[in-house]
Amino acid sequence: MKFQPLGERVLVERLEEENKTSSGIIIPDNAKEKPLMGVVKVVSHKISEGCKCVKEGDVIAFGKYKGAEIVLDGVEYMVLELEDILGIVSSGSCCHTNSHDHKHAKEHEACCHDHKKH
């Protein structure tokens, strides 16, 4: 399904949180807080033609109670206003933009995560 955000909005896929503590305790999905970072999947025409400050593939940080959650083709996304983006963590070259698994992302230098923990 294709989705095009309107106004100054972006479609973001949240990054997955670690489901295990450093001591090996598995955290159930309902006890985990949702991550406050994600990969920009689609940028509205107003942003792509205007400020160009955020682009597809950027890893961004956003506020805890910001945006609207939607589900497209069984995948959860966030629709965020440009002003709700706190900053860019990594620009366009994170392993998540290429659908790589964390386990295989160690060779990607520009990835947004510290893979020593994984």
Curated annotation (Swiss-Prot):
Gene3D superfamilies attached to this UniProt entry: GroES chaperonin
GO CC annotations, alphabetized: cytoplasm
CDD domains associated with the record: cpn10 (cd00320)
Localization annotation: Cytoplasm
Disulfide bridge partners, by residue number: none
UniProt KW keywords: Chaperone, Cytoplasm
GO MF entries: ATP binding; metal ion binding; protein folding chaperone; protein-folding chaperone binding; unfolded protein binding
InterPro entries, sorted: Chaperonin_GroES, Chaperonin_GroES_sf, Chaprnonin_Cpn10_CS, GroES-like_sf
GO BP: chaperone cofactor-dependent protein refolding
Primary subcellular site in the record, as a coarse category: cytoplasm
SMART domains, alphabetized: Cpn10 (SM00883)
Subunit structure: Heptamer of 7 subunits arranged in a ring. Interacts with the chaperonin GroEL.
Function statement: Together with the chaperonin GroEL, plays an essential role in assisting protein folding. The GroEL-GroES system forms a nano-cage that allows encapsulation of the non-native substrate proteins and provides a physical environment optimized to promote and accelerate protein folding. GroES binds to the apical surface of the GroEL ring, thereby capping the opening of the GroEL channel.
Similarity comment: Belongs to the GroES chaperonin family.
Protein name per the record: Co-chaperonin GroES
Organism: Helicobacter pylori (strain Shi470)
